[in-house]
């Protein structure tokens, strides 16, 4: 009989919460959505999918410490963007999970991501050096990806050499697999599970979607 996979076979994960939240005006991890913080929602959704969770955070560690998460700050100073958080995730994984070939990243501002995210991304990988990236409705979501930790040195060099530091541009330099996730059907219409919350208005929109999501999510 084949049992459920062990958590030892799941990838480790790092929640990306190291940005400045300039459009929101306050840290996103502590924002309340449907009575629970965004960080709480992301952890609850992520924990069954992965071997362990850390958080990339460059500010007040209190929200993370309440959950017992290890805080992984950027290793490159100056808030240079999400690639610095991805690099920190790779370096952390090499130190803490030496047997892991990849690390999963998810941003803290997208709390409705699929419950099948890690499993489907992992299934798409055919080689140790391949990046697996989530898509929905034909749109790439580059922060939802499985990253080969062996790319850490290359990524660090890219961050220092490329002025724009675009995540998509870094992915384009490497072998990658794409995984298309369906929209969530609801009574109010289809919802993109990668709907991200950058502004107070988008937070209100996410609140409006919550009543329609019960038992509808992939």
Curated annotation (Swiss-Prot):
It comes from the Bacteria. Mg(2+) binds at residue 109. Its main location: cytoplasm. GO terms for biological process: bis(molybdopterin guanine dinucleotide)molybdenum biosynthetic process. GO terms for molecular function: GTP binding; metal ion binding; molybdenum cofactor guanylyltransferase activity. Transfers a GMP moiety from GTP to Mo-molybdopterin (Mo-MPT) cofactor (Moco or molybdenum cofactor) to form Mo-molybdopterin guanine dinucleotide (Mo-MGD) cofactor. Belongs to the MobA family. This is Molybdenum cofactor guanylyltransferase. It comes from Rhizobium meliloti (strain 1021).
């Amino acid at each position: 009989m084949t049992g459920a996979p062990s958590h030892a076979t799941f990838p480790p994960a790092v929640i990306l919460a190291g940005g400045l939240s300039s459009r929101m005006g306050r840290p996103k991890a502590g924002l309340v959505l449907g009575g629970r913080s965004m960080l709480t929602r992301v952890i609850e959704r992520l924990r069954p999918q992965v071997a362990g969770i850390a958080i990339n955070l460059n500010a007040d560690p209190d929200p993370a410490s309440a959950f017992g998460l290890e805080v992984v700050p950027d290793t490159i100073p100056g808030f240079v963007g999400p690639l610095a958080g991805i690099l920190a995730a790779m370096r952390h994984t090499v130190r803490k999970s030496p047997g892991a070939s990849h690390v999963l990243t998810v941003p803290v501002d997208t709390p409705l991501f699929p419950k099948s995210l890690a499993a489907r991304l992992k299934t798409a990988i055919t080689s140790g050096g391949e990046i697996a990236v989530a898509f929905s409705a034909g749109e790439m979501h580059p922060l939802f990806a499985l990253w080969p930790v062996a790319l850490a040195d290359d990524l660090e060099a890219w961050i220092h050499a490329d002025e724009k530091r675009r995540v998509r541009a870094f992915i384009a330099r490497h072998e990658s697999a794409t995984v298309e996730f369906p929209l969530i059907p609801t009574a109010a219409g289809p919802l993109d599970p990668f709907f991200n919350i950058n502004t107070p208005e988008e937070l209100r929109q996410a609140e409006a979607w919550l009543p329609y999501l019960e038992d509808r999510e992939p």
